[in-house]
Every structure is written in C-alpha cells, then in structure tokens.
From Swiss-Prot:
NCBIfam families referenced in this protein's UniProt entry, alphabetically: ATP_synt_b
GO cellular component: plasma membrane; proton-transporting ATP synthase complex
Protein name as annotated: ATP synthase subunit b
Lipid bilayer topology: Single-pass membrane protein
Gene assigned in the entry: atpF
Biological classification of the source: Bacteria, Bacillati, Bacillota, Bacilli, Lactobacillales
Top-level taxon of origin: Bacteria
Alphabetical UniProt keywords: ATP synthesis, Cell membrane, CF(0), Hydrogen ion transport, Ion transport, Membrane, Transmembrane, Transmembrane helix, Transport
Species in which this protein is naturally found: Streptococcus sanguinis (strain SK36)
HAMAP family, alphabetized: ATP_synth_b_bprime
Length: 164
C-alpha cells in the first residue's frame, strides 16, 4: 500500500470539498426546517411548562379556597352547636320552672281540696253526732232505764246504725 502525498492531498481536498458542499446544501435546504422544528419543540416545551405552572397555581388556589371554606364551615358548625346548647339550656330552665310552678299549683289545689273535704267531713260528723246525741238523749229521757236496759238500748241503736 503505497499511497503518495499527492493522493492523500487529493483525497483530503475531495473529502473537504464534499463536506463543505454537504454543509452548504444542508444550510440551503434543510437548516431552516431543522431550526424551525427545534424552535417549535422549544416553544411547545415552554408552553407545556407554562401550562403546568398555571395548572399548579390554579390547583393551589382551589385547594386554598376549599380549605378556607372548610374552616368557615367548621366555625359555623361550632357556632350552631353552641347556639343549640344555649337554647336547650334556656328551654330546660323554662321547662323545669314551669314544672315546679305546676307542681306547686297542683299541690296547693290538692291541699285546699283536702282541707275543704276535711271541713265538710267534720261538719257532717258534727251534725250526725249532734243528731245521735239528741236521739239518744230523747230515747234515754223518754224511758227510765237501769244500767242494763240503758246498755241494751245503746247496743240496739248502734246495731240499727250499722244496718243503715
């Protein structure tokens, strides 16, 4: 393999010329398309990054709004529970007061009825005792009785009262 310097230089010039011609042709016909494709790709990546950032920001805002709404709901729920407890306590006190008042009123009415019934019973008993006393006295006075006859008369009268 004897290659001369002339052949090496010739091959070098041919390869260099071919390379320069290839670079020229690529620049003339394909370079614009390649740069356009790369620019489009760079723009798409940039747009995707911007879209992802906007979506992340929107998600964060939505999460914050939901958290704020949840906190507001919790505060409102606590307020409603407290109001319900206060209302229940007020109602409880009112109901207990009404029940105590009603019980006192019923007790006073019952005591009044008992006293009235007692007075009526005493009046009735007094009348009956007076009638009995008068009847016994008239029977005793109408007859002159000895002890035995008097006892027998009283027993007979008591028996008549028991039958009536």
């Amino acid at each position: 393999m004897n290659i001369t310097v002339g052949e090496i230089i010739g091959n070098f010039i041919l390869i260099a010329g071919s390379f320069l011609l290839l670079v020229f042709l690529i620049k003339k016909f394909a370079w614009g398309n390649i740069i356009g494709i790369l620019d489009q790709r760079a723009q798409k990546i940039s747009d995707d990054i911007d879209g992802a950032e906007a979506a992340r920001k929107k998600a964060e805002d939505l999460a914050q709004k939901r958290e704020d709404a949840l906190a507001g709901s919790r505060v409102e729920a606590v307020s409603i529970v407290e109001t319900a407890k206060e209302t229940a306590e007020k109602n409880k006190a009112g109901i207990l007061a009404n029940a105590a008042e009603e019980a006192g009123r019923l007790k006073a009415k019952a005591n009044q009825e008992i006293a009235q019934n007692k007075a009526e019973a005493m009046s009735s008993i007094k009348g009956e005792v007076a009638d009995l006393t008068v009847t016994l006295a008239s029977k005793i006075l109408s007859q002159e009785l000895d002890k035995e006859a008097q006892s027998e008369l009283i027993d007979r009268y008591i028996k008549q009262l028991g039958d009536a």
